[in-house]
């Protein structure tokens, strides 16, 4: 009891042994190898990438760097709770735009919520927790309608689950 009936695959055992030998080391805080690989995959420079310990950390970092004081942030409601948490933690005023009946995004209302003080618009696409998404045409309209002072943050954590042809 308590033991598997099958032996561990040799390749797996060797990989685990190699990793365990370095377990006492801190990871590269700048993620140089990962940064280079992702940049090469997407055809961008490594300096265009930021990595963190999950989206919560990155959302908090974005909020702290790009919004503060009398600035303003826009996001949907309901949507990923970390947008609200980051704003409250940083004492940044925000507008949470209600989703439409059926929990669809209200792109016109999102744009209407933007003020001269707005610096960030968070869009969880597809939305967490509802799964609603903004299709390609509506997303292009949203992004091209935002003032240049507003940074759109597209949180696409669940994009791989969307199979709709109009999702970009």
Q: How would you name each of these model-derived features?
A:
Residues 14-17, 68-69, 91-93, 137-141, ...:
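Glycine-rich, phosphate-binding/catalytic loops in enzymes
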Residues 65-123:
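PLP-dependent aminotransferase-like
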Residues 88, 105-117, 129-168:
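Active-site pre-lysine segment of PLP-dependent enzymes
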